[in-house]
């Protein structure tokens, strides 16, 4: 259901936005961890895709740039786990 944001006070709007951003970051970390495990298991290739990139574009319907950024972030965080905490 779509919320009428014009009904929110300034403070409510700011608080709501901050909450959404926190949730979004949490989901991003979870998404990257899932991609990391998929990459480790080579599940995209096992599922018939030439690469994790192709899986992300075709199956997850990410734009090419989004797929590339997420895969790069996933692989960097796999090498340097501290990156997850920075997100």
Predicted regions mapped to residue ranges:
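N-terminal acidic-hydrophobic amphipathic loop/helix motif that frequently occurs adjacent to catalytic
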Residues: 1-60
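Amphipathic alpha-helical "recognition" segments
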Residues: 49-87
């Amino acid at each position: 259901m779509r919320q009428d944001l014009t009904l929110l006070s300034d403070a409510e709007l700011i608080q709501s936005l901050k909450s959404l951003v926190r949730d979004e970051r949490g989901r991003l970390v979870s998404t990257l961890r899932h991609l990391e495990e998929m990459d480790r298991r080579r599940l995209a290739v096992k599922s018939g895709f030439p690469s994790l990139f192709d899986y992300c574009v075709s199956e997850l319907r990410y734009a090419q740039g989004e797929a590339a950024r997420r895969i790069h972030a996933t692989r960097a965080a796999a090498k340097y786990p501290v990156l997850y905490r920075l997100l």
